[in-house]
Amino acid sequence: MMEESGIETTPPGTPPLHPAGLAAVPSTEAHSAATSSFSSPNVSGMESLPPHVYSTPQPSLPPVQPSAPPPFVSMSPAPSVPLSGTSVPPSVSPSPATAFSGPPMSHFPPATSASGALLSAPPSGPPISGFSVGTTYDITRGHAGRAPQTPLMPSFSAPPVTGILPAPITQQASMTSLAQGPGTTSAITFPEEQEDPRINRGQDDAPAGGIWGFIKGVAGNPMVKSVLDKTKHSVESMITTLDPGMAPYIKSGGELDIVVTSNKEVKVAAVRDAFQEVFGLAVVVGEAGQSNIAPQPVGYAAGLKGAQERIDSLRRSGAIHEKQTAVSVENFIAELLPDKWFDIGCLVVEDPVHGIRLEAFTQATPVPLEFVQQAQSLTPQDYNLRWSGLLVTVGEVLEKSLLNVSRTDWHLAFTGMSRRQMIYSAAKAVAGMYKQRLPPRPM
């Protein structure tokens, strides 16, 4: 009859009622259809019900057991009303107070056998695996037995399991659910990261070795070491450019200790700069040694003899230790071409501890022939060291013959390059060879 009237008592979006009330509604409709079949099609037994019965959800109360049903109040008029072709006026329908003088509709028990035989209760939910719909929800409620206009949105829940699933060892998303009781619904659960129970580390735990291990690892990186060395060199270059006197103090130190067999700054400074450039840090000091040959050596053999004799004299006198690394510089002149004389410096590095001995020579600086002849004429024929050289040096002759020329650094006036630079170039080369021959130091 409700389908024919086309009247819906509740909008589709009405919240669900208690299951007892849902079961009572179709039973009441069936009972009214059986007892009041003579009524007009325009009159429905549900018209006299107040709207709040279906539009307002009732508070959830414990369902009443069917074993003790309360008295049922008929919702249709007495069957003794005479049949009529006209519609029954609305006043004939019982008032809301009379129709619901008993318990509320949500408390009505399911229909009895007579009513249940006419209309059976709808299923609790669609038979879809993986979805669970609570028994408290009726899909036909509020739609007069028709299919709902709005599709249902059942909640998804994992299959019920007993207990808590064990957390996996690997970091995987897991669905953890508790045992589900009958008729209960579960919201969608999201995966959570599970930590390995075997790993028990605090938030402030440092890696193995602590901060010192980290610093050691970074310092041991070749690329980082190269960057630090370049930065250090740049800073040192800036300091030494602003104050050249700071160079010996900045680069002095380390395990390399060298003695130069001379107290002349032109030799000591050149050797110090070269070895500190190659080794980074080096202690270089000067100690005057005797060559025991002529002041102006002539020839390669004489120059090498003078450099070696300076080292030996310091060792014999005890000025330096027998195992001390020493560097000796000795300049000499040689006739490399007919009537062509050149000034050359000989460098000797001797390391008794490692058994290393190296020789190197500076670039050759041309010397005019007349100045060499003057030095030869000033040397007596019976000079006892004539076998090794001349009594008067070429520098002394040039200093007397030319203005603004120093006997110790006349090379600058003739070539534009100082003697210190020439010694530095040769000393840097011999320092590089010396470093290659040293055994590797343990890290």
Swiss-Prot record:
Supply the Gene3D superfamilies for this chain: 3.90.950.10
Name where it's found.
Answer: Golgi apparatus; Cytoplasm
Annotated keywords: Cytoplasm, Golgi apparatus, Phosphoprotein
Q: Which residues carry this modification: Phosphoserine?
A: 406
GO MF terms held by the record: identical protein binding
Composition bias (Low complexity) maps to 81-96, 109-134
- Write out the biased-composition intervals (Pro residues): 59-72
**What does this gene product do?**
May act as a regulator of the protein kinase A (PKA) during embryonic development.
Assembly notes: Interacts with PRKAR1A; resulting in PKA activation.
Per the record, the similarity remark reads: Belongs to the PRRC1 family.
What name is this protein filed under? Answer: Protein PRRC1
